[in-house]
Amino acid sequence: METKDLMKYDQLSPFEVKDKLIELAQSHHERMMLDAGRGNPNWVTTTPRHGFFQLGLFALQEAERSFTDMAHFGGYTQSEGLKARFDRFVQDHTGTAGIDFLKQGIDYAEKALGIPPADLLLQFCDAIIGNHYPVPDRMLKHCETICAAYIRKEFGAGRPFDRAFDLFAVEGGTAAMTYVFQTLKENKILNVGDTIAIGSPIFTPYLEIPRLNDYRFVEVEIAA
């Protein structure tokens, strides 16, 4: 796009600019642009998904080691010899998309975070199959360790960030916002009819949730 053409977009809102960029991207498929969007991107990262599905296949193999006399049934993951069986699975699927990513993740957790591979594999296999539901009630133990390390790295701004904290995994950003508002209300920090400030533009549900009958907050938008 020519510089002179860009000038006419100066007066558009961020949402209007976003819509125009999507229009341009869809009209030039030979040079598609990635749309980070507001929760609905036009792309997916494929490598982690390949790794996820390979983990699922391995977990199913582990489940099928139990109840072998019953067709189409499986049991809980057995911890004894689990790491050795995983290593064989990786070797047998050398070159398959996602295998290297999965193995590298297990190796990283051991070397960087001190998580025993067998313990992590047991937890991952149980989780992806859905064993022991609804335990845990908050977050998988080793997943919390991994996520906490990520948060320390990304939000520590290069400074030491060693204070312990708990994490609570939720369904997604919208659910998280709902829980935040509900917690603030239950603890009497916010009450029905209170005024809150919200930075915008932002994912639309974040603007809509405070208006629900449960909260009825008065919103003041802080435009970016």
PLM region spans:
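Conserved core of the PLP fold type I
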Residues: 70-224
